[in-house]
Curated annotation (Swiss-Prot):
Domain of life of the source: Bacteria
Record keyword Acetylation present: no
Function: Can catalyze the hydrolysis of ATP in the presence of single-stranded DNA, the ATP-dependent uptake of single-stranded DNA by duplex DNA, and the ATP-dependent hybridization of homologous single-stranded DNAs. It interacts with LexA causing its activation and leading to its autocatalytic cleavage.
Lineage: Bacteria, Pseudomonadati, Pseudomonadota, Gammaproteobacteria, Pseudomonadales
Pfam family, one: RecA
GO molecular function, one term: single-stranded DNA binding
Family annotation (CDD domains): RecA
Protein name: Protein RecA
Subcellular localization(s) per the UniProt record: Cytoplasm
Binding residues for ATP: 65-72
Cellular component per GO, a single term: cytosol
Keyword annotations of the record: ATP-binding, Cytoplasm, DNA damage, DNA recombination, DNA repair, DNA-binding, Nucleotide-binding, SOS response
GO biological process, one term: DNA repair
Length: 354
């Protein structure tokens, strides 16, 4: 850049700082790059699939999926992990369906959790904005976008048409709160539902409610699906769950994680650690037996997971080894939550157990 351009730029920057304050414009090279702070989801595989060890603070996150797929369970798990770090969390329950007893079983400190059950969509989003601007809240969950009913729709007749009203409400609210979320370094999670588009011949007919604004403003979008049942004998005790990162502005997208959600207990973290430790060579598996550092820890996955539950220091050390390896830049974690690599061993385990 020649001297005249440098002088013109310096004058422009000086005028901008005088008018808008110091830091209104800055060179990116003048400051060291800082890692994006993240809050764990409670699932090791999902934390790794997200690329930064969890959901990013100061950003908007959308979690969507079919009914009973684990959306609320996942967000309550995030709240539980945040509270363990001393964070203050809020739950905007637009669906009026939050079960404190279930939240407590997942590890949420319900006594410290702030809960709001607003009457209208405008009220819910206004409360969310005020909580963000307080700079005192670390995590806010809005459950759900589909339940953010505009005031005009509530006050109108049942058959009245309100085309695009909810989409306009979401668009206006997100324009207003996005900057505040960044300044407050607050994680805001919107839970969303799936609807079907009529007349779609090619591509997926699925779409989410509330218009397109949230798709653009969200830094991370997670598609959560129930893929099967977890059984003990004939009794169904949980769900096999797959989460796909369909959008990620802070790491490479389209990774996915698979884990189990046990009814009344939440994400089966110890079982996930066993699977990932075998997949990446930290735990050896011979037939039905699992060994860690030369010592047998259990016969079968369930017994090995119980060993980790009874020995939290070993569990934490194993989890740290997995995180250190897979969260290193340049490591491919596309199949981090998949179990294809140990399917053959699982067959051998089933044969040994039977």
């Amino acid at each position: 850049m020649d001297d005249n351009k440098k002088k013109a730029l310096a004058a422009a920057l000086g005028q901008i700082e005088r008018q808008f304050g110091k830091g209104a414009v800055m060179r990116m090279g003048d400051h060291d790059r800082q890692a994006i702070p993240a809050i764990s989801t409670g699932s090791l595989g999902l934390d790794i699939a997200l690329g930064i060890g969890g959901l990013p603070k100061g950003r908007i996150v959308e979690i969507y999926g079919p009914e009973s797929s684990g959306k609320t369970t996942l967000t309550l798990s995030v709240i539980a992990q945040a509270q363990k770090m001393g964070a203050t969390c809020a739950f905007v329950d637009a669906e009026h369906a939050l079960d404190p007893e279930y939240a407590g079983k997942l590890g949420v400190n319900v006594d410290d959790l702030l809960v709001s059950q607003p009457d209208t969509g405008e009220q819910a989003l206004e409360i969310t904005d005020m909580l963000v601007r307080s700079n005192a809240i670390d995590v806010i969950v809005v459950d759900s976008v589909a339940a953010l009913v505009p005031k005009a729709e509530i006050e109108g007749e049942m058959g009245d048409m309100h085309v695009g009203l909810q989409a306009r409400l979401m668009s206006q609210a997100l324009r207003k709160i996005t900057g505040n979320i960044k300044n407050a370094n607050c994680l805001v999670i919107f839970i969303n539902q799936i609807r079907m588009k009529i007349g779609v011949m090619f591509g997926s007919p699925e779409t989410t409610t509330g218009g397109n604004a949230l798709k653009f403003y969200a830094s991370v979008r997670l598609d959560i699906r129930r893929t099967g049942a977890v059984k003990e004998g004939d009794e169904v005790v949980g769900s096999e769950t797959r989460v796909k990162v369909v959008k990620n502005k802070v790491a490479p997208p389209f990774r996915q994680a698979e884990f189990q959600i046990l009814y009344g207990k939440g994400i089966y973290l110890n079982g996930e650690i066993v699977d990932l430790a075998v997949l990446h060579g930290f735990v050896e598996k011979s037939g039905a037996w699992y060994s860690y550092q030369g010592s047998k820890i259990g016969q079968g996955k369930a017994n090995s997971a119980k060993f980790l539950a009874d020995n939290p220091e070993i569990c934490k050390a194993l989890e740290k080894q997995i995180r250190d390896k897979l969260l290193t830049p340049g490591v491919d974690t596309k199949a981090v939550g998949s179990r294809e690599a140990v399917v053959a061993d699982d067959v051998a385990e089933a044969d040994a157990d039977s």
